[in-house]
Amino acid sequence: MSNDRKKKVLITGGYGFIGSSFIRNLSKNENYIIGNIDKLTYSSNLNSLEKVTNKNNYTFFQEDICNKESIREIIFSFEPNYIIHLAAETHVDRSIDGPEVFLKTNILGTYNLLNSSKEYYEKINGQDNKDFKFLLVSTDEVYGSLETNQEKFT
């Protein structure tokens, strides 16, 4: 990789609500090459990226972030400048009924991404190494509920 090339952004969970919005906006800028990793689960919306899928700066990888070998292969072959991790099991009520899939995806999947990203980061040199970023996007659910008598915060 070199600085005169377009920046490559690898996004997980790109067919989700936030991920698809991010990709639609980012795809308008031809200075970015976009990779989208998504397992395509119940919360994926294939229609959300219908105007993006045929663009030259977009590639889709249907994969589970829990598949360590595939995730490593995607990262090393795509050679991203930035990884934006949005993939997660959502809907708190579902986590109460079946926590295993939440633990697997949200913890093990994130761990796999971090390990492969670290390995990739240690491989790249020069400015690409200095510019590389890994961004984890979470949810407001991690803060818990705000009681009605508590002061609001942002």
Segment roles from a protein language model:
Residues M1-T154:
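N-terminal Rossmann-like NAD(P)+-binding domain of SDR-like oxidoreductases, especially those catalyzing
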